[in-house]
A protein has these predicted regions:
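Helix-coil boundary/capping segments in enzymes
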Residues: 1-157
Length: 164
């Protein structure tokens, strides 16, 4: 993958977290309050929390943009195979290979909204950040031989408990 003498770095690669990330990874004491990812569109980034939706759908999946052209349908088809495979770490590594990317800094997508839910109490926010970080660690272990040098996960931090 190395292009000449240089490695190709994607400094801002995003993953789409599984809808059940927080129920699966959060401390059991918070499991009944954990948000769940919504999946109405191929790139749905929203969360359900306390019976309400939070976040937004991916830009290309934004329903208000459907009338503005064909991009919505094209992108739904483009991303469908990845969504059907669960946006897994293996899928991410394949995409990096297709694009010729050697190293990537991995950022959240759905996780960007997780800690912005209004009125979330600090202990829950800290538990959600830990759950995301635990999941991200597992995500980056798909191929341990490549993970150390190929992907760096950008951890999630709760603003109320940034070091936990």
């Amino acid at each position: 993958m190395v292009q000449g003498k240089f490695k190709v770095l994607d400094s801002d690669i995003h993953i789409i977290e599984p809808p059940d990330l927080w129920p699966r990874y959060i401390d059991p004491a918070f499991r009944d309050r954990a948000p769940i990812g919504l999946t109405e569109d191929e790139g749905d980034l929203r969360l359900a929390y306390n019976g309400k939706g939070w976040g937004r759908v991916a830009i290309d999946a934004d329903r208000s943009r459907r009338r503005q052209g064909r991009n919505y349908a094209l992108n739904q088809e483009r991303w469908r195979p990845y969504a059907e495979r669960g946006w897994t770490s293996k899928v991410q590594l394949e995409a990096m290979d297709i694009e010729g990317i050697d190293v990537a800094v991995v950022y959240p997508s759905r996780g960007l909204f997780a800690l912005t839910i209004p009125d979330m109490d600090p202990p829950l926010a800290a538990a959600m950040a830990r759950a995301y970080n635990d999941w991200l660690h597992d995500f980056c272990q798909e191929n341990p031989e490549r993970s150390e040098e190929r992907r760096v996960g950008k951890e999630c931090r709760s603003r109320w408990s940034p070091y936990h």
